[in-house]
Structures are given as structure tokens and as C-alpha cells.
């Protein structure tokens, strides 16, 4: 597969689609494909099953999240607010 140091994972597109689009795709896909921390067992083993569905390879927990990341910025905010309300702080 045609990959280089600069284009990395987007080398598969070759000369098509332009530099800006490929940079955006590269940033999203590299972040998406790395291992994420599981919310159940706190170990790095979460991989993307399909769009918005994530699975931990260590404990087998399956949960929903964002399309490209298991925890979205809005999800973090909501969890923080719920924790604050339930915790009484």
C-alpha cells in the first residue's frame, strides 16, 4: 500500500481529494483507530466495532459512543453534570 511519512493512513487515496481533505481524514482516522480506555475496566483495549458502537477487548463490554471516538465532548459534559447533580456538589 502506498503510505509515506507525511500522508500516513491516507496514502490509499493517492493523488485524489486534495491535501486539506486528506489531512482531516488522517487526523480523524488515527485518533479513531488507536486503543481507547474502557469505561468499565479502565484498561486500554476499546476498539470500534461499527459506527458509534465500541467494544472492550479485555472485559467484553459493549457500549455506544461517538462515531469516531468512544466519548464525545458533549458526553463528557453530560457525565460531569450528572455526577455533580447526583453527588450533591
From Swiss-Prot:
Calcium recorded as keyword: no
Q: Which intervals hold the zinc fingers (C4-type)?
A: 38-59
Cofactor binding mode and count: Binds 1 zinc ion per subunit.
Output the Gene Ontology terms for molecular function.
Answer: large ribosomal subunit rRNA binding; structural constituent of ribosome; zinc ion binding
Instruction: Name the GO terms of the biological process aspect.
Output: translation
Kindly indicate whether the keyword Protein transport belongs to this entry.
no
Q: Indicate which residues the UniProt annotation says bind Zn(2+).
A: 38, 41, 56, 59
* One CC-aspect GO term: ribosome
Alphabetically ordered keywords of this record: Metal-binding, Ribonucleoprotein, Ribosomal protein, RNA-binding, rRNA-binding, Zinc, Zinc-finger
Necessary cofactors: Zn(2+)
Give the multimer and partner information. Part of the 50S ribosomal subunit.
- Briefly state the protein's biological role: Binds to the 23S rRNA.
PANTHER family, alphabetized: 60S RIBOSOMAL PROTEIN L37A, LARGE RIBOSOMAL SUBUNIT PROTEIN EL43
Protein name in UniProt: Large ribosomal subunit protein eL43
Lineage of source species? Archaea, Methanobacteriati, Methanobacteriota, Methanomada group, Methanobacteria
Q: Which gene encodes it?
A: rpl37ae
